[in-house]
Amino acid sequence: MVQFYSPNRRTVNRHIITVTADNLDAQGQGVARHQGKTIFVAGLLPGEQAQVQLTEEKRQFAKAKLVKRLSDSPYRVNPRCPHFGVCGGCQQQHVAPDLQRESKASVLEHLIRRETGVTVSAKPVILGPEYGYRRRARLGLHYQIKQRQLVIGFRQNQSNELVAIKECPVLRPELEQLLQPLSQCLNSLKAVKRLGHVELVLADNGPLMILRHLDPLKREDKEKLGTFSVQHNVAVYLAADETSLESLNELPEPWYQVDGLKLVFSPRDFIQVNDQVNQQMVAQAIEWLDLQPNDNVLDLFCGMGNFTLPIGRIVQSVVGVEGVATLVANGQYNAKINNLDNISFCHENLEADIHHQPWAKLGFNKVLLDPARAGAVGVMSHIVELVPEKVVYVSCNPTTLARDSKILLEAGYQIISVRMLDMFPHTGHLESMALFSR
């Protein structure tokens, strides 16, 4: 038998070492140093000393698991959730909120400085409630044959297994209180073994639920779901596949308010998870853009108008460009019901060649963009060609924000302000926004 060897394979030295963390990374892992190498340790806070065991070793860094904590940081707090440490939803409930925000802001500042050479402050942080903030969640469903029970919950940390969730303090209370009765309802269905997942969403006009089912539901099951809907005042939608949606109720369309405007959305549409931070984020963008009645504004990756509509109330015209057709349709509808006839929405793929797209032939003096995690490298050169006075970049990935910032800086723009958005407390997610000006 031929055997193959990898000469570059690094053997992990699994003996126990003692380290002291001096920092946190964005994921909430303790950052320590040992013999010149950076060691990342989940569960360790700055100032804490611990015995750890290496689990992965690279040339420049290593990962380790906590064996025994030898001291406690004053920033260590008791997690509110009984599932913390097993559930993969939150990683930082053991960390005082002030330290969470400080660490994320420092990571953002470091990434921008490393990529652009510019020193910025990402504070003051835009923040909201530490718990009870999440107005949208997707829960997995798995039928356990031996236990004859459907598990409803989130994925375990670093695993595909589900944690049965009975409570979740980061959810809005209106959604958290649905968890146990929803579990009872779904376990009573004939189709209990053929359910995929469930999404809970809190609109301003009430909660809604989307149930993904793998086989057509019997009338008896629909009646049980209808009873659940009435008893708990929740709109129920059934999804037989990834595109179809059947409403069990004759209830009004879901909507939320931003900047005093009503935005109607489809149950599956993307909306910002944290309402309070979203309100502040929109207000900050409007302030930074210094909007005037004669402005012509471009809103890229605009969704259904979360920024577009509030901007449209102030300026001469605004064009929103979005790649998802349903979001564009909802944006157009929202502009109509809010009597904003100076807003245009374009359905275009911003990851394709944009130069032949109709909006690209127009002139704008101010630009806002809110791309997905991949960033906006495909449109940055065109933004530079527009020569706008101000650019506001909203980001869910600090790495791509830092990368794309470089293009604006090389074109003569300056970073005027940066803010870290604490959109997802107790998690490693880092949202931010930046203002650029010529």
From Swiss-Prot:
Gene3D superfamilies: 2.40.50.1070, Nucleic acid-binding proteins, Vaccinia Virus protein VP39
Superkingdom classification of source: Bacteria
Gene Ontology terms describing biological process: rRNA base methylation
Lineage of producing organism: Bacteria, Pseudomonadati, Pseudomonadota, Gammaproteobacteria, Enterobacterales
Domain TRAM: 9-68
Binding-site residues for [4Fe-4S] cluster, renumbered to this chain: C81, C87, C90, C168
Gene: rlmD
UniProt keyword list: 4Fe-4S, Iron, Iron-sulfur, Metal-binding, Methyltransferase, rRNA processing, S-adenosyl-L-methionine, Transferase
List of catalytic residues: C396
Record-given protein name: 23S rRNA (uracil(1939)-C(5))-methyltransferase RlmD
EC number: 2.1.1.190
Record-level Gene Ontology MF annotations: 4 iron, 4 sulfur cluster binding; iron ion binding; RNA binding; rRNA (uridine-C5-)-methyltransferase activity
